[in-house]
Structure formats: structure tokens, C-alpha cells
Amino acid sequence: MARDTSSKSETDQLAEWQRPRQLSGTRLILTCGLPGAGKTELARQLATRRGALRLTQDEWLWALGSTPWDKPTREKVNHELWQLAQEVLRLGVSVVLDFGLWTRIERDEMRSAARGLGVGVELHYLDVPTDELWRRLEARNAHPPWDSAPIRRTDLDGWIHLFQAPDDAELALFDSPPEAN
């Protein structure tokens, strides 16, 4: 809908255009879970269904000739993807961010920043039993690019103790997907 600016001064018009837009339909959609939980597949489905930009950390790392094991590069990629996500959200385009988000503080920071942009925030937590995670990881490890830097069972076992699963109180802080309303 075009704005009627015929009776407004140039200063008033500029002020109106600079006001933050209400981005009511725009969403930051986060996936959360351990490796092998199905985050990337879910992110693909959500991006297609919602017409959103999907940003998957691991895919960017592999494309840059790195691996998820390269912590300095991973941190740089995460930072840049998060900056890009915020710019895209400001434009009114939904973003699916596929990072894993193992800690509550990461999820809190992203939720708070997105709320500051005036967008809704969803968290899709995938809680998968350890044996199923390992079965999926073994299958993934057999194919490129993961066959060159496979996840070991000892890695998974250690990560389970580091992962901070969202509880019901935290999940209640996020918006429900539109199809759930």
C-alpha cells in the first residue's frame, strides 16, 4: 500500500520513512539440536515452506574449504552469517538459521536481537535419542564431505554433556509457528 504524502512536509515524510517498520510476518526461525538430529533437513523444509532464506553453518564452512572442526573459522562464519541474517530480517525477509545453538545464552541473545528488530522468533528443538543420533552420524560419515572429517562416537558422547536442551520455560519464550496457531 502506498503512503499518501501529498499533505506532509519533506521532513515529516523523511521521518515517516525512517520509522522502524512493523515486520509482523517476518520470522527468525532457529533450529536447535545435536549433530544428526535432523536440523539441516528441517531447515530446508522450513525455508521452502515459509519462503525464507536458509543459512546453514556447516554448508558455509565446507564451501570455504574448512570444516566444522576449525573453531576460528567456524566462529567467523557464525558471526558473518548472524550479521547477514539480521540485515535480511531488517528487509522483511524471514531467515532460517541452522547453527545448532547448544547453549541457552546463544538462543537468548538471538531471540533478544530479533525481537529488537520487530520480528517473531521460533525455536525448533529436535530431541533425538543418542543411539539414533549415532546411527544417522555413521551414515553421514560415509559420504563427502563428512567422510574427510567424520564425527566420532566419543565426540557425540562428550557433546551430549555440553548441550543445554531448552526446557518448557525457555520454549515458552519463543513464538509458535504460524501453522500451529
Residue ranges and their predicted role:
Residues 117-137:
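Conserved phosphate-donor/acceptor-positioning beta-strand/loop module used by diverse small-molecule
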Residues 37-93, 139:
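Conserved substrate/cofactor phosphate-moiety recognition/catalytic segment
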Residues 34:
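P-loop (Walker A) phosphate-binding loop of NTP-binding proteins
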Residues 59-61, 102, 127-133:
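Conserved nucleotide-binding/hydrolysis micro-motifs of P-loop NTPases
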Residues 72-121:
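Glycine-rich phosphate-binding loop used to anchor ATP phosphates in small-molecule kinases
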Residues 31:
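Hydrophobic anchor at the beta1->P-loop junction of P-loop NTPases
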Residues 2-6, 20, 28, 45, ...:
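Conserved GTP-binding G-domain of TRAFAC-class P-loop NTPases and closely related GTPase folds
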Residues 9-22:
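Pre-Walker A adenine-sensing motif
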